[in-house]
């Protein structure tokens, strides 16, 4: 890898190519255009149909049923959510009317895990009252819990480089019961990958640092982190400067948001990419090329005196002064060996089948189970990763801001029908292709069995539901969705030593390429990806 030189400024009226049109690409374009409205920016989208947003996709059926085919909420606590919301309001103030939230005390903020000792039993975690606490302690989920806590507090085991989440947790907690029975479920829900195949340095670098500083993750977690609070303030001030809004305004919004577990949009998550895209398409210097598949990228190096910028040629027919890679094709041909090696190390992402379930007039979810949904731990040996109770989330949404729309004000409860069911099931299809899946078999194996077992619906009622013409089941195969952030790739809890930081710096300073998206963000969430886009755009200035 080359030593870095001083970053040369993009020329006035220069050209920038942005690969992809997902949320990362859209926000990168927005942030860069705020700083440099003179630049000609072209987004290159592989798909021929004019839908932007990547994995974010709210589908409306011909019966106007809203189904989320990707993420459906944002975490209020994530500082990137504040950046997203402030940016969208700046683009279009009417977005305020679309913003909704879930309260911390709401049913939709409850979460369950499947008990591996009794797979038909859902156990609330964390338990919210004494009876639920006793239920948790009696379940298989609590096996080894007390021993694990004391082992972490008193163990003097030393951190190792490049540990998997599984190896780290077993070393800290003394055995694998807690990670197999509880922790693995959370990682299945986020990454759709086994904890043995995930890098601890990537997934939980803060816990790695807590162990290094305090010798125990529990002791470290109990310490007040003043550095983190100061970093948050500095980050918010950077956001405010770029968006040209008052520091105190963005700080107040973040303060309000961070106590809210979930943020959503009335018309669905596609509100987010659609708002950004509609704003960008009004700009004469921004263009989108649909049906353009980026397969090859060639960096024409700058002259020996480093006076001129390198130019980048895409597919031998488009040339740009700068290229931003938000979407990086797995088979991208590029004359940069270190990037190629990193992409090969990540390998193919996970394959997940999403099963959307909807019934317009029947509520299958009992009051005792009303929650965000449930996850399935590793010890259950099931391909079912988890189930999201969309109808519970929707019926618990509240407006984030007083509406400026009189029509909306008249209808304060925008989900008035409590007697419907909407759920999304996530099934691991790792190693399978779309053609390998029999939808009827999956309907029997996962849909029917979930209704019978976890939702405890009598078999006669389940058969009636399955044969009901109003019962909608839709399948979406998410191919190569989330990268596998494996150990030994080069992730580090020290950001300056992380392979992503090293590559970012080399690509930008030596080759005039910036990067973003899931393969370079600090985490797999939408706010993480947008913050990465913000940082990438700001580095160019």
Provide a role label for each language-model segment:
Residues 24, 49, 330:
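Conserved Rossmann-like nucleotide-cofactor binding loop
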Residues 1-14, 221-230, 238-249, 304, ...:
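Eukaryotic N-terminal low-complexity, Ser/Thr- and Lys/Arg-rich leader segments
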Residues 33-60:
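Glycine-rich FAD pyrophosphate-binding loop
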Residues 62-155:
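Dinucleotide-binding Rossmann-like beta1-alpha1 core, especially the glycine-rich loop
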Residues 35, 290-423, 431-432:
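Mid-domain catalytic core of redox enzymes
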Residues 150-293:
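Active-site/ligand-binding neighborhood in enzyme catalytic cores
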Residues 8-43:
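N-terminal Rossmann-like FAD-binding beta1-loop-alpha1 element of flavoenzymes
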Residues 6-7, 15, 126-129, 386-541:
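Conserved flavin/dinucleotide-binding core of flavoenzymes
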